[in-house]
Amino acid sequence: MVDWLSLLPWNKIFTAACGCFLSDSNYIHLMESNLDALQKTMEELKNGRDDLLARVSIEEDKGLQRLALVNGWLSRVQIVESEFKDLLEAMSIETGRLCLFGYCSEDCISSYNYGGKVMKNLEEVKELLSKKNFEVVAQKIIPKAEKKHIQTTVGLDTMVGIAWESLIDDEIRTLGLYGMGGIGKTTLLESLNNKFVELESEFDVVIWVVVSKDFQLEGIQDQILGRLRPDKEWERETESKKASLINNNLKRKKFVLLLDDLWSEVDLIKIGVPPPSRENGSKIVFTTRSKEVCKHMKADKQIKVDCLSPDEAWELFRLTVGDIILRSHQDIPALARIVAAKCHGLPLALNVIGKAMVCKETVQEWRHAINVLNSPGHKFPGMEERILPILKFSYDSLKNGEIKLCFLYCSLFPEDFEIEKDKLIEYWICEGYINPNRYEDGGTNQGYDIIGLLVRAHLLIECELTDKVKMHDVIREMALWINSDFGNQQETICVKSGAHVRLIPNDISWEIVRQMSLISTQVEKIACSPNCPNLSTLLLPYNKLVDISVGFFLFMPKLVVLDLSTNWSLIELPEEISNLGSLQYLNLSLTGIKSLPVGLKKLRKLIYLNLEFTNVLESLVGIATTLPNLQVLKLFYSLFCVDDIIMEELQRLKHLKILTATIEDAMILERVQGVDRLASSIRGLCLRNMSAPRVILNSVALGGLQQLGIVSCNISEIEIDWLSKERRDHRSTSSPGFKQLASITVIGLVGPRDLSWLLFAQNLKDIQVQYSPTIEEIINKQKGMSITKVHRDIVVPFGKLESLHLYQLAELTEICWNYQTLPNLRESYVNYCPKLLEDIANFPKLKG
């Protein structure tokens, strides 16, 4: 007979029975009170969940994506709520078993276990309640693909169709597009990119990367991460860490990687790109001039991009020249067909030559063009010999020698390099190419006029969303060819831009070279002492320079332009810089320079000195006597600030035309604005570490201001004084405002609740506001309406604004009451502005 008593779990029974009286948890005794608390807290949790879901729904309607953190919290709530429902179903049975005033139970084991579950569920509900307040619930979705702006194309549709069919073929994972320079490979790739936008394909992300001839792995990584991680928190990471970030991101995605302009094999594994496969469904498409590169990249399919057919070439040429010119004489169409035929179906040549012929209205001009294009060609390494002489016709069509020199100067920059327009014009002025009056406004205007002319001639390309230009690589090759006397004097122009050299190359013909460009070459040390009797231009920015030898500047008597900017590790210059007696342009911005060498005082011809963002520069005392001929002095965000002593120095610079400055004292700011000649020369102003109840900016005195920075300031109120001294007694209602102010950056400003004074800068193109905890509105409605009522020329706030960045503004709730604001916005970045999310919906062009 079975001994049933021996089979009972006496140890558990004993433990449970003791637990009725001895357990610290008091699961049984506190069961009823815990159940009451659980039901109340669960109701509160469900209300919190519903409120959160409502917020999430609003943000998702705006096109934002809920945060993974929010999703995780909601999932946990769902699990806890399910457990709670199970506990409710058993509640009546378990509470009915309680006896001895709730201190014991008829079934101690069951009640003990149930009470433990109630306690656990209650603790989880309380924990979730403590985490229910999310400042931000959703974020901007990275678009699958970003549309490229493409000019009208002819004869490309068939090629796009062929390439697209190849792309959607499961067997083809890597596609190579090859053909000569200027054939339209980039346009073809841009067209494929735009098809991903139009068709909303199943790919998670389409990434565009410009590779170029002298590519750097880290540069490619930065472009990829810039697309995947707009937060930019990866910028200071190492190459290997960036590779890891890219790999971790892309291995979870079905991606398309578009690589433009490969000149050699690129190690995608080293970059961090996982290989495309049938399993992940990803694709890689690249363009190159070389079929060999297609083989090295292991392309599953290669497509040759050919020149246009004669009919297609004529159609593109006709569209470029325009029917008005072609109809101006009955013989011109036939002559135009001959000119078009000389372009050999190359789209770049057809566009460039077509633009050069836009104003040719006589038969004689067209016949002359044919004669020029029939002239004997030359041989060019790496380029079909029939193309560059044809493109040269557009160069020959430029109005005068100065414009031609300006164009050729652009070839000194790396391939695909985006050149700042203002910086380019500054080079041109110091080189003596434009405007004998140097830095008067006319010089800058003339520079912009030349840039516009070169853009319209298709010799320069306008960059999107920036005040920059760049060169097509074939046009750049032509410019380098012309600049070296058609290849006969290649040693006179030394351009190593973009190459990895680390040390100054040994193959430079120092005694012959006229212009040298080592931009972004990773040069770390200059140890040579060359004899350079003809060198006039030396460009060394964007490098890793640490040391320049004592003898390097000893024998450069004709050097006019020296650019050492963006070499953060460069902390001193050799005293022998004093030997550069012809130097007119010296750029030391974004360097670690601590003090200027004594020898600088011998540079009597120096007219341009840039010391912006020199964060350790200690002194400028004596600059008026040292460099009396300065016309441009740039000190924006330099450690060195303007004080009373420097004010006196600056006033003694009789030729000063342009000044950018950093000011920390409100009284100094007031005094500077009171000196007309000084104030009128200010183009950039940085207010830093300034503490004052009120700061006044006079828009008349600072009429030339183009860039304003307010950094780490504690200012209760910023006020605009728009009256000049002469008009102060005749209160006119006409507001001149800051007519030239294009860019404003506000970082770490404490005090004001709004920035309504920005209405006085109606030509703003770029606004950045970050880490400013007291700002609640960009434009306050009451203040804004008051300003526009008095100054009726202020119609639409920020009517010309193209870029708006708002970051870490905890109290910001509104941008502007006028929803017509931001009509021309092209780029926006809004992050960590939790109270602004509802207002974003009022501005269709603004993306959170």
From Swiss-Prot:
Domain NB-ARC: 137-439
Domain notes: The LRR repeats probably act as specificity determinant of pathogen recognition.
Protein name: Probable disease resistance protein At5g43730
Keyword Zinc: no
Family the entry assigns: Belongs to the disease resistance NB-LRR family.
GO biological process, one term: defense response
Coiled-coil boundaries: 25-62
One Gene Ontology term of the molecular function aspect: ADP binding
Positions of LRR repeats: 534-555, 558-580, 582-604, 605-627, 629-649
Residues bound to ATP: 179-186
InterPro entries: Apaf_helical, LRR_dom_sf, LRR_R13L4/SHOC2-like, NB-ARC, P-loop_NTPase, Plant_NBS-LRR, WH-like_DNA-bd_sf
Function: Probable disease resistance protein.
Pfam families: LRR_14, NB-ARC, WH_DRP
